[in-house]
Amino acid sequence: MLLSSALCLVTSPAVHAAAPQDTPDLAPLAPVPVQRQLDWHDRRFYAFIHFGPNTFTAVEWGGGQEDPEVFQPGEMDARQWVRAFKTAGMSGVVITAKHHDGFCLWPSAVTEHDVASSSWRGGEGDVLADLSKACAAEGLWLGVYLSPWDRHEACYGTGEAYDDHFVTQLTEVLTGYGPIKEVWFDGACGEGPNGKRQVYDWPRYIATVREHQPDAVIFSDAGPDVRWCGNERAIGGETNWATLRRDEISVGTSKTAELNRGHADGTHWVPAEFNTSIRPGWFWKAGLDDGVKSLDVLMETYRASVGRGGNFLLNIPPDDRGLITDTDVARLAALGEVLDATYGRCALAALAEGGGVVARASNVRGGEARFAASQVLDPGRDTFWAVDDDHDPEGPVRAWAEWDLASPVTFDEVWLGEPIQLGQRVERFRVLCRGPEGRWKPIGAGTTIGPARGLTVGEQTTTGLRVEILGSQAAPALSRVSLYLSPPRVAIEPAGAVAVSPVEVSLSTRPGAVTRYTLDGSEPTVDSPVAEGPVRVDRSLTLRARAFDGRGASPFPAEAIYRVLGPDDWKAATQFLVPPTPGLRARLYEGGWQTLDQMEGRAPLETRDAPGFDIGLATRAEQCAIAFEGFLNVPEDGLFTFATASDDGSRLFIDGDLVVENDGLHGMDRRAGKVALRAGFHALRVEWFNSRGGAGLQVRWAGPGVGAEVPIPADALFR
């Protein structure tokens, strides 16, 4: 909502409701975006879909020789995909219509490497048609990824013949599936089935898009409309110019640092798109649900992409059923809740609606209300604060604007924006708020702003805000100043425990919010108990908590699992008539394993005696494994912590029960577990393997009679 001009006070000249012709409009600073790029900026956050034969073969880059019959998404439901994306607040979707393997997700007239050659849906399936209809039904836009690299097509690498082939496929996609808003060109250029590389005819490809879908932006490393961000983590540079010296950048460039930050003296408007995947890899693979990015990681990625002037393209691949997994659907829904709870209400604009904001500035262009500092409270780019071209800077400050607040406002994020239809100008800025003593205190600073710049500033409560422009390529202008307060969280301490006696648990949140909790694993509601002091946990249970404030329940859940051990949970010691012999038995294996489950049923090559956990006994440095077996002499009754640090995987068992799970391919990672043991001997088994590369194993413990965590000594090991 715009404030009336009466609320905007300026030092000089006075604001007046002048006719628009009294003061020249702010002149554009070239280069500026064209309309299709402005429309792209408004899309902000959308989905990437990698789907095809790779979904069924568990590879990232197919070789082009896949049998189309492997493509069998028997439960495919594009409407389910789109609805999941919509819950996250996404505006559209880009799908890999053709990846490097050359397989087409639509029935193409110029290849048999496509959905029509699969028995899926009797050879009548068309993924693009399904997705186009789903997007139209749910109000999302559609974009397509079409790889010019084709590892299947025989004419790839022959020049014009392949260009004709690719343009035909591009035309099929652009003319058969309704409006296409983005065309995504991958820069990969490898060898085809004939061992040759193709020199892509980019001008022809671009002209084809312009002919059939003139409103679509074209993405590649070099644009021409949108550029890659230079990494696959979707992390933007602290400095991010939407402008680029485009003629210096080619598709497949190694200038990733330049792509990440852009060029301050760019010749063309080519903003950055930031892409990453919600799970490991671009295509779905079984068993990787634990690798799905957390809410915190997704939110930080959003801030590092959208909050640094780009758009966020998040890959969510369908599984081999043709569905978005339940794990991903739930994560997207939770992300949508957090985004809405964080950015759905601007604290500054809400106060302004009641007339509670008074704006002033170092200068207002022509003294006209249409350029007043109050205009930034409407986040649209068509209303903005601007200064005169000849505005004299005050020391290091090129221009400043302030907003006095009638009542205190609490926030932890500040977002700024420029009217990018007139170019990108700001080079340096800082944000200040009024402290309790009435003085301005800096809370954040940055370089570029562009279409959006978000700053995380820690929780602040203030009655005044000030933005200073410290450097600008031309007369500065701001179209947005927004204040947001992220939803409250609950801190649980300790965050889970295994204990032999009751645990006192502290639940805390920020002032102004209350914590409600349950002890039966159910979701806390407004009727759940309020945590007004420590919560006593005297049995094994799952504690769940959630913060509530004036906006309702926070979208951030908190959970901790406690195991309070009873008499039946203690492991009794093994009694020996004859004392065991010091040391362990080491069973040695060979094999190209990826998990320790592959050890089961295998016979060792040999068995040796070992004084401890010595992986130097392995028969070779790679593709090897060892199982150490014996007994551990526990000095006292108590709760013990066991840990392994290993490269690659390891597991530790006590009396046949798994205590430490550290399996899989990884570097030197540490995992730990706890168990209650009676004094005496306990059966011990430690498994370890190495696939390739570095190798290592450490086995440690802590507890009564041991003290802080140390390596298990040789004198505690027996066989």
Model-derived regions, located:
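Short, compositionally stereotyped local motifs that mark structural "simplifiers"
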Residues: 485-582, 606-609, 613-618, 625-627, ...
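Aromatic-lined ligand-binding clefts that engage carbohydrates, nucleic acids, or primary amines
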Residues: 97, 507-509, 632-634, 638-652, ...
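Short beta-strand-plus-loop segments that form exposed binding edges in beta-rich domains
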Residues: 468-474, 685-693
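Beta-sandwich interaction modules
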Residues: 443-475, 670-675
